[in-house]
Design a protein with these regions (language model features):
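Charge-dense, helix-prone N-terminal extensions
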Residues: 1-112
Length: 112
Protein backbone atom coordinates (compact mmCIF):
# COMPACT_ATOMS: atom_id res chain seq x y z
CA UNK A 1 0.00 0.00 0.00
CA UNK A 2 1.26 3.47 -0.80
CA UNK A 3 1.29 6.28 1.75
CA UNK A 4 -1.29 8.08 -0.41
CA UNK A 5 -3.60 5.06 -0.36
CA UNK A 6 -3.25 4.78 3.44
CA UNK A 7 -4.17 8.46 3.79
CA UNK A 8 -7.13 7.98 1.42
CA UNK A 9 -8.48 5.09 3.53
CA UNK A 10 -8.11 7.18 6.70
CA UNK A 11 -9.74 10.19 5.05
CA UNK A 12 -12.81 8.04 4.37
CA UNK A 13 -13.49 7.82 8.11
CA UNK A 14 -15.82 10.41 9.63
CA UNK A 15 -14.44 13.79 10.75
CA UNK A 16 -10.79 13.01 9.91
CA UNK A 17 -8.48 15.97 9.48
CA UNK A 18 -5.06 15.63 7.84
CA UNK A 19 -2.19 18.00 8.55
CA UNK A 20 1.39 17.91 7.30
CA UNK A 21 3.94 18.37 10.08
CA UNK A 22 7.67 18.23 9.35
CA UNK A 23 7.12 16.13 6.22
CA UNK A 24 4.79 13.59 7.85
CA UNK A 25 1.00 13.57 7.54
CA UNK A 26 -0.81 13.54 10.87
CA UNK A 27 -4.37 12.15 10.84
CA UNK A 28 -6.68 13.21 13.66
CA UNK A 29 -10.28 12.92 14.79
CA UNK A 30 -11.73 15.21 17.44
CA UNK A 31 -8.32 16.86 17.81
CA UNK A 32 -6.60 13.56 18.69
CA UNK A 33 -3.97 12.06 16.41
CA UNK A 34 -4.66 8.42 15.60
CA UNK A 35 -2.14 7.86 12.78
CA UNK A 36 0.94 9.50 11.31
CA UNK A 37 2.15 8.66 7.80
CA UNK A 38 5.81 9.09 6.88
CA UNK A 39 7.09 8.41 10.37
CA UNK A 40 9.50 7.09 11.51
CA UNK A 41 10.54 7.35 7.85
CA UNK A 42 9.11 7.22 4.33
CA UNK A 43 7.12 4.05 3.63
CA UNK A 44 6.02 3.71 7.25
CA UNK A 45 3.18 4.89 9.43
CA UNK A 46 2.43 4.73 13.12
CA UNK A 47 -0.99 4.22 14.72
CA UNK A 48 -2.17 4.48 18.30
CA UNK A 49 -4.06 1.47 19.61
CA UNK A 50 -4.76 -0.07 22.98
CA UNK A 51 -2.39 -2.90 23.94
CA UNK A 52 -5.22 -5.40 23.35
CA UNK A 53 -6.11 -3.85 20.00
CA UNK A 54 -2.45 -3.94 19.01
CA UNK A 55 -2.15 -7.62 19.91
CA UNK A 56 -5.32 -8.51 18.01
CA UNK A 57 -4.29 -6.70 14.84
CA UNK A 58 -0.66 -7.85 14.92
CA UNK A 59 -1.97 -11.44 14.82
CA UNK A 60 -3.51 -10.63 11.42
CA UNK A 61 -0.50 -9.24 9.56
CA UNK A 62 3.28 -9.07 9.57
CA UNK A 63 2.99 -5.40 8.54
CA UNK A 64 2.53 -4.33 12.18
CA UNK A 65 5.04 -4.21 15.03
CA UNK A 66 5.02 -2.46 18.39
CA UNK A 67 7.17 0.64 18.59
CA UNK A 68 10.24 -0.21 20.69
CA UNK A 69 10.05 0.75 24.36
CA UNK A 70 7.30 1.99 26.63
CA UNK A 71 5.19 3.57 23.88
CA UNK A 72 5.01 0.25 22.06
CA UNK A 73 3.89 -1.53 25.22
CA UNK A 74 1.12 1.07 25.48
CA UNK A 75 -0.14 0.30 21.96
CA UNK A 76 1.84 2.60 19.67
CA UNK A 77 2.23 0.47 16.55
CA UNK A 78 4.54 0.77 13.54
CA UNK A 79 3.01 0.00 10.14
CA UNK A 80 5.16 -1.14 7.20
CA UNK A 81 3.00 0.19 4.38
CA UNK A 82 4.45 -1.77 1.47
CA UNK A 83 3.32 -5.10 2.97
CA UNK A 84 -0.01 -3.88 4.35
CA UNK A 85 -3.06 -5.25 2.53
CA UNK A 86 -6.15 -3.14 1.85
CA UNK A 87 -8.53 -5.11 4.09
CA UNK A 88 -6.16 -5.05 7.07
CA UNK A 89 -5.41 -1.35 6.47
CA UNK A 90 -9.10 -0.60 6.87
CA UNK A 91 -9.25 -2.55 10.13
CA UNK A 92 -6.08 -0.95 11.50
CA UNK A 93 -7.23 2.59 10.71
CA UNK A 94 -10.76 1.97 11.98
CA UNK A 95 -9.36 0.60 15.23
CA UNK A 96 -7.01 3.56 15.70
CA UNK A 97 -9.83 5.99 14.84
CA UNK A 98 -12.13 4.35 17.43
CA UNK A 99 -9.36 4.27 20.06
CA UNK A 100 -8.78 8.02 19.60
CA UNK A 101 -12.43 8.53 20.48
CA UNK A 102 -12.33 6.33 23.57
CA UNK A 103 -14.12 3.41 21.91
CA UNK A 104 -13.07 -0.25 21.78
CA UNK A 105 -10.43 -0.98 19.15
CA UNK A 106 -10.27 -4.75 19.57
CA UNK A 107 -11.14 -6.90 16.57
CA UNK A 108 -12.16 -10.53 16.77
CA UNK A 109 -12.37 -10.97 12.99
CA UNK A 110 -9.93 -13.30 11.27
CA UNK A 111 -7.31 -12.11 8.81
CA UNK A 112 -8.43 -11.57 5.30
Amino acid sequence: MTPEAFIAVASGLAMVKAKTVMGAVRLAVGGKTFATVGWPEAGWAVVRLSPDGQKSLMAQTAALAPEPGTRGRRGVTLVRLRVLGDAVAGRVLSAAWRHAQGQSDTFTAKAG
